[in-house]
Structure formats: structure tokens, C-alpha cells
Amino acid sequence: MPRGRGRGVALLYSGWGTYLAQVAEVEVTGAGDVRVHRVVCAVDCGRIVNPDIVSAQIEGGVVYGISGALWGEVTLKNGRVEQANFHNYRVLQMNEAPPIEVHLVRNSEAPGGIGEPGTAATAPALGNAIYAATGKRLRKLPLQPGTLRHLCIDDTNRSP
């Protein structure tokens, strides 16, 4: 992989009766900005009645998971939530969404959940990809660009 890029893996074991493996590929710029280039999911959710709906649910969950992992912070001021709506609560926009591949494992087991698993695996996959790209482990969500900027600046200020 080129410098500043990395892949991260996350596994969801029997969440909502579904097994899911997710790989995220990200790029972290010298300024600490994160760009998600691609997400691949393998999903075993038991008997699949409508594969298109299963794929769409996983894709939507991944998009929501990226938004939450990168920007999903709710702050309080004087006991009230500051984020009133999407004008001040950042979510991934359509033109920012990476390609998302969903591979379905077909079997005859009982159907499991499909809405949540894509979301639940996204933050760990992104965190591991950021670590692979930078060597820096972030241990708090959201994976804030400010934290990455600080870490990237620290690295450039170090002498060899």
C-alpha cells in the first residue's frame, strides 16, 4: 500500500444472529484528514429472502457507521444537546461515500439481523485501518481529525 494508506479488519461474531467480516481501506493525509476509499463486507445472516435488501441494509449501515466513527459526537451546553439537526451534526454525504462491496454467504440457517451488523463493524475496521496507515492507535470515538492532525504534526516535528 502507498504511504498513508492502510486496511483494517473487523469481525462481528453472532451479532443479531449474523456473522460479518469487514475490511476498510483508508488514506490519512499529512494533515490528519481521513478518506475512506473502500469497504468490503462478507455477511452470513442465515437464509436470505431478498439479497438486494440485505445488501442495501449492509451498505446503509456502513455509511451510517462511517459517519458515526469519524464525526459522531454529541456535545452538551448548559444541559442541552448542541446538535439540533444535520446542519450541525456531520454525516457522510453521497459524494463522499466509498464503494461498498457486500458478499453474501448463502445457507439454510434461520435468518439473522441485517440492519445493525454493517454499522457495528465499521468503527473497528476504520480504527484498524488508520492504525495500519499511521502506526497510531486511536482509542476514542469519534476518530476525530483533530486528534490525527495532532499526531501527524508530532511526527513531522520529530528529528530522525
Go through each PLM region and give its residues:
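Cofactor-binding beta-sheet edge motifs in enzyme active sites
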Residues: 1-160
